[in-house]
Amino acid sequence: MSTEPVAILGTGMTDMSRRDQSAETMAHQAVHEALGDAGVEPHELSLVVAANALGGRLCEQGCIRGQTWLRKAGLGDVAVVNVDNSCAGGTSAAHVGSLVARASAGPVLVLGVEKMWTGDRAATLAGIEDGLPADYRADMHARFRPEENPGGSILMGLNDFWARQCMNDRGTTVEQIAAAAVKARYNASRNPMAQITKATTIDEVLASPQVAGVLTRLMCSSFTDGAAALVLGPADRAPAGGAFIVGSVARSGNGEMDYHDRLGETARAAWETFGCGPGDFDMVELHDATSAEEIYALESLGLFGHGEAGPATLAGDTAIGGRGLTVNPSGGLVGRGHPLGATGIAQIVELATHLRGRGGTRQVEGARLGLAVNTGGVIEGDAAYVGIHAVAAGR
């Protein structure tokens, strides 16, 4: 856990609608953009923390991925530490990077990069399933029978189970889930770095092909290539009008708690650590692997009351310029995209973009405090990792 502010000196991110770039090319682009934004020279860096999930399976690089993909980036001999934490690799890297930046003499570079489009869909799905314990996968296959679902994914089967749980326990409707997808894709259509470039309607979401159970294709995140980077440093190096990571809390599940209960437990620890509550935030970037999960997570985190997130979404309250908390102004995983190891960093980049007044047509006006929530992996129904960052505007 951390509470001392860490300055976000610079940010960088690739266009997540592209599929034609290598992991190395994307890493270089995000890194040099972040360094340029920060005005930091490579020789000033004290550490690089690099996150990736699927490089072993999809890029034939089982180890030393950060060193391999950055060896021609001109960073010299700065130490590179690699992080692999499934969908939460970038969030984990930011957590580690913020801890180091607080104590280090030089800035810390945090990078997340993922290459998911390789032409081998089965290999990508298998890599995603590595986010489950090996001795748990057979049980998951037997339970969710991916061969019987159009999407062919046990994790989308699990997400359908959660969607139905949210509908049965909280009164969420399929129209409310579709409304979350519409919001995500509209926000993404105004985000020049997003995977999705076209807005949609509730009817189009509901009519799109089935993935698993109640979930349709337009309600779900999809494979994404992308990279995102942060340059972090001590608060006294922050430029005027900058943004700061003012809190970071992380928890790992061990199979003893329900996934959404783990979200709630981690959120309560975050509020205590941050010294603020769920009502203090202007915007949140969260892990919407599906649009149903957006609604379920909002309530599990305590950002909305039981059964309230779905109606608020349908009413437009969570939209940019809506009456309430702005949810996933980037478009989230469903709209911006979900390049696993880069997702958590992309969330923080998005919050910093708004806090620095750089959001363009999707700017969350007057935002002063944002929340980034990301998860990775599933341990017997529990979240393997939950990471929460609070990001604030400078004074």
Whereabouts are the PLM-identified features?
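Beta-strand segments within the central parallel beta-sheet cores of soluble alpha/beta enzyme folds
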Residues: P42-N52, A79-N85, P107-G112, Q176-V182, ...
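Conserved catalytic cysteine-centered active-site region
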Residues: S2-E4, R18, G55-P107, K115, ...
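Acidic, glycine-rich active-site loops and adjacent beta-strand->loop/helix elements
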Residues: G12-D15, A51-G56, N85-G89, G112-G119, ...
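Extended C-terminal subregions enriched in glycine
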Residues: A269-A292, S300-L303, L333-P339
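Conserved active-site "lid/cap" helical segment
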Residues: M1-A88, V96, W162-V174, Q195-T201, ...
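Condensing-enzyme catalytic core mediating Claisen C-C bond formation in acyl metabolism
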Residues: M1-E24, A138, N149, N168, ...
